[in-house]
Amino acid sequence: MTDLPDSTRWQLWIVAFGFFMQSLDTTIVNTALPSMAQSLGESPLHMHMVIVSYVLTVAVMLPASGWLADKVGVRNIFFTAIVLFTLGSLFCALSGTLNELLLARALQGVGGAMMVPVGRLTVMKIVPREQYMAAMTFVTLPGQVGPLLGPALGGLLVEYASWHWIFLINIPVGIIGAIATLMLMPNYTMQTRRFDLSGFLLLAVGMAVLTLALDGSKGTGLSPLAIAGLVAVGVVALVLYLLHARNNNRALFSLKLFRTRTFSLGLAGSFAGRIGSGMLPFMTPVFLQIGLGFSPFHAGLMMIPMVLGSMGMKRIVVQVVNRFGYRRVLVATTLGLSLVTLLFMTTALLGWYYVLPFVLFLQGMVNSTRFSSMNTLTLKDLPDNLASSGNSLLSMIMQLSMSIGVTIAGLLLGLFGSQHVSIDSGTTQTVFMYTWLSMALIIALPAFIFARVPNDTHQNVAISRRKRSAQ
């Protein structure tokens, strides 16, 4: 990229800045949840909604982000995304109740949903095709650093300042990013087809109400009748979308995608697989602090080996898949992740704390291999005219399944424990043990889906390109 104009390089830095903000926020909050609960006067069992409100909003808003960027312009939407994300961060820091915090996190999610896909679109507009891969590698690198710094930085801020600072640090960064976007980024637009508003609303309602219904009386305090009503509304909304999308060329996501068997299997496996693995980044720091008595900073440091293991495997996952094939790799990594989850629980409860970093490093390696394999399996055989739509649907499913995973983790904690789980409670470790055993079972279940992948699905010439497109 050395031959790119200075203006283009600055524009790439702005996009990288946005990627860093969004990725940092996905991990920095996890370590602070027990402290937030204490400050807001809430049970730690309710705090999973702080993550769910953000991730679910991202899932709901993702389908609209690309269309808005094409219609209104990439600069205008990227600027709006940064402003909304920054305002959401300010309101999070000012929140005095859990409900206020959840609303502020949802506002953050609207900005986060637009930031990454619009950033990818911006790179496509400003960089020549032959340099697109190098440019995307450059702008996504800060996005890989964010999860590495997030847990430790979150723990450090909570321990030596307060949880409010995990949001306040976004404000100066956001202001600089917004000003730089207005000054340096071109406002590319293009012809767009009519937005499928009906399909968007049906999907949004279906995803949101079913997730709320899943949280149930333990998290939302709803009556059984209200929960049944939410389930009915969600199911009806999704069925109506299927009827709406059938033979509709303007549908948000074409049902033709599911004619490709590897896409159908990959999407189903990604949805089920990320429900299980989505529990881990939430549950691990909560368990370390509430179950084992770690300080926030110590718990944050313990998350770093997991991220390092994940980053290290990305270099060799192509060779692994090409050598053994998708079915073997996905079944093995799914069952392996379940076993590593049990190993983490066992070593932690036995007090072998010096072993935990190695177990978490192994967990990161296995999880990264599975993620990359799921992403590329899902997209690799799609025809070119459906690749963009398939990638958008996969991105939405990734966020939705993560929000469901965190919701189920909170539900399991509420099922096995009281509303007053604390470090001083004698039953706390038992509650976490049952929760961890249930998680290991949920993580293993997608192996049945991956076992249906054709055994000869291993030719993977374009895996590295497709893999990055799905991250």
Curated annotation (Swiss-Prot):
Mind telling me which Pfam families this protein's record contains? MFS_1
Q: Which residues lie on this side of the membrane: Periplasmic?
A: 1-11, 70-76, 125-137, 186-196, 246-262, 307-341, 417-430
Subcellular location field? Cell inner membrane
Which keywords belong to this entry?
A: Cell inner membrane, Cell membrane, Membrane, Transmembrane, Transmembrane helix, Transport
Q: Name one GO molecular function term.
A: transmembrane transporter activity
Top-level division of the source organism's lineage: Bacteria
The record, for InterPro entries, names: EmrB-like, MFS, MFS_dom, MFS_trans_sf, Multi-R_MdtD
The record's SUPFAM superfamilies line, in alphabetical order, gives:
MFS general substrate transporter
GO CC field: plasma membrane
Which residue spans traverse the membrane?
12-32, 49-69, 77-97, 102-124, 138-158, 165-185, 197-217, 225-245, 263-283, 286-306, 342-362, 396-416, 431-451
Task: Tell whether RNA-binding is among the UniProt keywords.
Answer: no
Segments on the Cytoplasmic side according to the record's topology features: 33-48, 98-101, 159-164, 218-224, 284-285, 363-395, 452-471
Q: How does it sit in the membrane?
A: Multi-pass membrane protein
What family is this protein classified in? Answer: Belongs to the major facilitator superfamily. TCR/Tet family.
What is this protein called in UniProt? Answer: Putative multidrug resistance protein MdtD
Species for this entry:
Escherichia coli (strain 55989 / EAEC)
